[in-house]
Amino acid sequence: MPLHYALTDALVALVAGWGALMLWRTDKPLAALGLALFGLAGVIGTIRITSGLIEPLAMLHKGVSQLGGIAGLALLLAQILRNKGLRLGTGVALGVAIALAALAAALPALGAILFVVMLIAAIALSLQSRNLLGAAGFAMMLLNITLVRQSDYLGADLSWHLYHLLVATWLLCVARGFLKEPRAA
């Protein structure tokens, strides 16, 4: 795996870290934790590539990317619901996020379906809340995972960098969208 692959993984980590910090400071803890999980995947990917521990860290990187992604997206959805006035306890939101990640671990084919369904729900809820930036970000991520990720047409290098660049852009859109919404009740 070429060293330059670490650049866009690091970008994901930086954007997610910044977004998580900003969301935490504005009392959006579920969204902050959701972004932090995506950032953790970026950190692990960056360490994996720059350290040369490609194979030893492969399963950890894949697991955190996929299962952390499911849990992170569930937490983003929970924050959207909380911002819409639903009294959703933190324990319930965390429990659902963990349960969905466990389900995806037990049935890997279901993980991709869950991710797509949650993205569609996030688009709809963001549009309903008039959070156009958030909706655009979630829609971009939906297109990213269906058209860009591991695309045979783009080649390995371009596919990797474009995918991670779009993930970082999605996280930025989502964070900025949450920051424009009122504080959770």
Q: For each of these PLM feature ranges, what is it?
A:
Residues 1-37, 46-63, 73-185:
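Polytopic alpha-helical membrane-helix bundles and their juxtamembrane interface segments
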